[in-house]
Amino acid sequence: MNILVTGGAGFIGSHIVNTYIEAGHCVTVIDNLSSGRLQFLNPKAKFYEIDILDPKITEVLKSEKINAINHHAAQISVSESLIDPLFDANSNIIRTLQLLQCAVSLKIEKFIFASTGGAIYGEQIYFPANEDHPCQPLSPYGISKLSAENYLSFFNQQFGLSTTVLRYSNVFGPHQNPHGEAGVVAIFCERLMKDQKPVVCGDGEQTRDFISVRDIAQANLIALDHSCTGKFNVATGNETSINSLAECLLRVSGKKISADHGSARQGDQSRSVIDYKKFHEGFGWQPEVSLEQGLVETYNFFKNQTN
């Protein structure tokens, strides 16, 4: 199959590109490199350094005979969305809508969209949250992802486009950007590389459902290979406090230092843990990488980058 991966030089997208290519698919990547890095790009992928809103994208889709779109280019920072909601909406709603219109006009068969579990569900009323949990986002980022999901549902119903929404829990792993606030594991790893203490926001008892990017890539392969139209959580169902995460990472690193605590962040929910039962029962996917194994892989990646 000929697949377009947007954001394919980025953290999650680059792993998906690798997985698709290993499975024998032909992959085209578009990335404006605002956060992606060429060093993460698989050399077997065809690469175009353009923005999704560039009119040339239609010609790229035509010339590469694209059958499926996997849309991972996005604004991913909750804090940035609070500062500039308009930029967030342009990135996560308008660009998604542009791609959806291209997909319909060119009769592309499938559209896979990277969404978010934690930010869409907001403060959970039950644990773990399944796909039927009320959506009550606490940030413009969560709002924009939910709006994009609704557009996918519309395009599926109105035009028959096969659409798959994957709602990720907190993804971590190699290639993650340590700059900003989106990836706490990467931020902690970078500080440890400098022999600095990890800084935990608030009291550290807030919880997240951490999932390895390798498991996310496998979920995207299943979404491509199966007719799984709809919305699916991709998570571990395991709840980990930020304090516990820091302790585990310090143990992995062997560093004889402790974590510090800073101020709490606006827009953060207190608990987040996601139920992946629907995706598992429908298509057999389940997480394979333990938290500690994933932290070892991520820490070693940052260590090798430093060396």
Which functions belong to the PLM regions below?
Residues 140, 148, 181, 242, ...:
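Conserved donor sugar-nucleotide recognition element shared by glycan-biosynthetic enzymes
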Residues 147, 151, 155, 188, ...:
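Hydrophobic alpha-helix immediately C-terminal to the catalytic Tyr-X-X-X-Lys motif of short-chain
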Residues 193-307:
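C-terminal substrate-binding subdomain of Rossmann-fold SDR/epimerase-dehydratase oxidoreductases
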Residues 1-171:
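N-terminal Rossmann-like NAD(P)+-binding domain of SDR-like oxidoreductases, especially those catalyzing
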Residues 21, 100-104, 153, 189, ...:
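A structural alpha-helix within SAM-dependent methyltransferase catalytic domains
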Residues 15, 36, 84, 102, ...:
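Generic structural signal for alpha-helix termini and adjacent loop/cap motifs
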Residues 81, 132-133, 163-177, 187-211, ...:
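A conserved pocket-lining segment of Rossmann-fold NAD(P)-dependent short-chain dehydrogenase/reductase
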